[in-house]
């Protein structure tokens, strides 16, 4: 059921409920149930109403936007284009995509995100740079497949903003596995890195595993936080002196934008 717009500049639309994943560290599929994608026509109608009411940013969100349409036969790429083609001055932001669910249609999604009204942004969680740990997490893809997706996006969208998720200290993560994660981040240089320390979740498969020592986890987290800062500073320095377009979505805490 479309939500009633409250006149906010940012309007968030949930495009699906549920998940197709089987990640060992997660309980989403238990809490949210099987995938249920909402009809494109309903999502577009909600977006149009929000834009008419003054929204300048439409956020398409789900537990995994890349799974959209796997149950209904519709496509995420078609949804993005239909929303972006609405009249008005606004931008579309696409939420988190599980890598395994865009392997077969990455070119179509890239084409949709290249639309001038869509942010050059993807949130593509990888969690680890180790193939061994990826397999133990049951992520459903390899590191090479992930790198291929990132490479395709960056070759087609040179100014891409890449956001990634990393879990620090998964129970089976060795020092060598952690170093592979460090190597991955230095290689792909994501604009945004969301770090989280592993913790057991009730009902998750991985909760039966022995956690690594807390001090080891903290040390690895500090290491990645430092790398995160280095990558951000390097990217920001490259923007010095450039002119960028911006969308104003809120008033700052000190009265600015």
Where are these regions (language model features)?
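Canonical Radical SAM [4Fe-4S] cluster-binding loop centered on the CxxxCxxC motif
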Residues: 6-41
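Conserved alpha-helical substructure of the radical SAM core
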Residues: 30-59
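Short, ordered loop/turn segments at secondary-structure junctions
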Residues: 31, 63-65, 198
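Short glycine-enriched, charge-decorated loop/helix-capping segments at active-site entrances
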Residues: 32-33, 135-141, 207-213
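Conserved SAM/AdoMet-binding glycine-rich loop
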Residues: 52-175
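Conserved N-terminal phosphate-binding loop of PLP-dependent enzymes in the Aspartate aminotransferase
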Residues: 88, 106, 190, 205-211, ...
